A protein has these predicted regions:
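Condensing-enzyme catalytic core mediating Claisen C-C bond formation in acyl metabolism
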Residues: 10-15, 39-43, 218-295, 303-304
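Short glycine/threonine-rich loop-to-helix capping motif typified by GTGT followed
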Residues: 272-281, 310-327, 344-351
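Structural signature of cysteine-dependent C-C bond-forming condensing enzymes
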Residues: 1-9, 95-111, 124-136, 153-161, ...
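Short acidic, glycine/serine/threonine-rich loops at helix termini
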Residues: 24-25, 119-122, 200-206, 272-275, ...
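ACP-dependent fatty acid/polyketide chain-elongation machinery
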Residues: 1-73, 249-261, 354-368, 407, ...
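Conserved small-residue
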Residues: 16, 34, 88, 108, ...
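Acidic, glycine-rich active-site loops and adjacent beta-strand->loop/helix elements
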Residues: 18-20, 112-115, 166-170, 194-199, ...
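Conserved catalytic cysteine-centered active-site region
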Residues: 2-9, 43-86, 115-177, 186, ...
Length: 415
């Protein structure tokens, strides 16, 4: 197998995956939950104000952070950094990097849409009347770059350490930019992905005030329903996913297990509205086409599409229109994972990329949870009802965020 892609850059292998998500705390657990199309939405009791109209979310199931963190780390970090660090540790363990790894050639690229805002919210609540009594680690906890920097500190990675804030596209942006750095020789390896922990009173209230959230408090497991005719808003989730990316030739030379490859990436901006997508999907479609071109592929080469699919009226319709434009009305099978996990904000794109790669490798795509009938069914081939067998082929994974941020990845299963 050649070490270079069609453009002469280094190929980018995925050699490690770690997840902490509502669907499960390992890639296999998450994949099985997605295959079952089981929603993880449930009532939550961590919201301080009774006036918050939405009382449910998708939370990471219990695990043992103390197995990953020192007591000092646990005292100094907040939840988003904890989830990111634990997912990163699993990805490193999966990748088993060489002992002679060059730290200056290994980086961390991480996306987050909310960052440390939950810590600032808690500090304002608990210490608003006595600000000098706030924890000494308040500022480091609230910095958006804390998760990436803590990961770099933990593993001694001294290469590029960058945090991306492209709203709900943040995790996908981080993966794509990490792949570019490896492709063009800036890094040999990178831990890349996304994380967010947005299930808090202020954040949930803010989304609810925008009328962006589902109000199905009496039936939360039916609330997230991407592309379904009865969708009424998204469900907030939390979580992190980190992937170890590596120069293909170096991974093969050391006998690493290769889970797949990032072959294409593109990003652009609608430049249309601060929270709404352009309804005709033209700019998002251009982003998809650019990602395919970056991978040296045509639309017919794609085995399936992992849609952003938030379960909102505007986003799902605009994305369906964009997919229709990109594929010229010949849509491959389209799935969307947020029916299971809700929306992890900056963590969603990274988790979905990891699971999309698994689906492409296995050749079995999950049905979209809770989706029965769709007004977009004439635009795209939605996978509903039961999992669908697909050919082993590259997958296009989409992420779109507030501000008109679009990011698309093309991932290929291992040869």
């Amino acid at each position: 197998m050649t070490a270079r892609d069609a453009r002469g850059g280094f190929r980018v292998a995925v050699t490690g995956i770690g997840v902490k998500s509502p669907a499960g705390n390992t890639p296999e657990e998450a994949y099985q939950t997605f295959l079952a199309a089981e929603s993880t939405a449930a009532p939550v009791d961590r919201l301080a104000a009774e006036a918050v109209p939405v009382r449910f979310a998708c939370l990471v199931p219990p695990f043992e952070p103390e197995a990953y963190l020192t007591r000092r780390e646990a005292r100094q970090i907040d939840r988003v950094t904890m989830l990111a660090l634990c997912a990163a540790a699993d990805a490193v363990a999966d990748a088993r990097p060489p002992g002679d790894l060059a730290p200056e050639r290994t980086g961390v690229q991480l996306g987050t849409g909310i960052g440390g805002l939950p810590s600032m919210e808690a500090t304002a609540r608990d210490h608003g009347d006595s600000p000098m009594g706030m924890p000494v680690h308040t500022v480091p906890r609230t910095m958006a770059n804390s998760p990436a920097c803590r990961i770099a500190m933990r593993f001694g990675f001294r290469g590029s350490c960058t945090t991306y804030a492209t709203a709900c596209a943040s995790g996908t942006t981080a993966l794509g930019e990490a792949a570019r750095k490896i492709r063009y020789g800036e890094l040999d390896m990178a831990l890349a992905g996304g994380a967010d922990a947005p299930v808090t009173t202020v954040i949930m209230s803010g989304f609810a005030r925008m009328r962006a959230l589902s109000l199905r408090n009496e039936e939360p497991r039916l609330a997230s329903r991407p592309f379904d005719a009865g969708r009424d808003g998204f469900v907030v989730g939390e979580g992190a996913a980190m992937l170890m990316l590596e120069r293909w030739d170096l991974a093969v030379a050391r006998g690493a297990t290769v889970h797949g490859e990032i072959t294409g990436y593109a990003d652009n901006c609608d430049a249309f509205h601060i929270v709404a997508p352009h309804e005709d999907g033209s700019v998002a479609a251009a982003c998809m086409r650019s990602a395919l071109a970056d991978a040296g592929l045509s639309p017919s080469d794609v085995g399936h599409v992992n849609a952003h699919g938030t379960s909102t009226l505007l986003n799902d319709h605009a994305e369906a229109a964009a997919i229709g434009r990109c594929f010229g009305g010949q849509s491959p099978p389209v799935t969307a994972l947020k029916g299971v996990t809700g929306h992890l904000i900056g963590g969603s794109g990274a988790l979905e990329a990891a699971l999309a790669l698994r689906c492409a490798s296995v050749g079995l795509v999950p049905a979209i949870a809770n989706t029965v009938s769709s007004p977009e069914a004439d635009l795209v081939d939605l996978v509903t009802g039961s999992p669908r067998a697909v050919r082993s082929a590259p997958v296009l994974s989409n992420s779109f965020g507030f501000g008109g941020q679009n990011a698309c990845l093309v991932l290929a299963p291992p040869p």
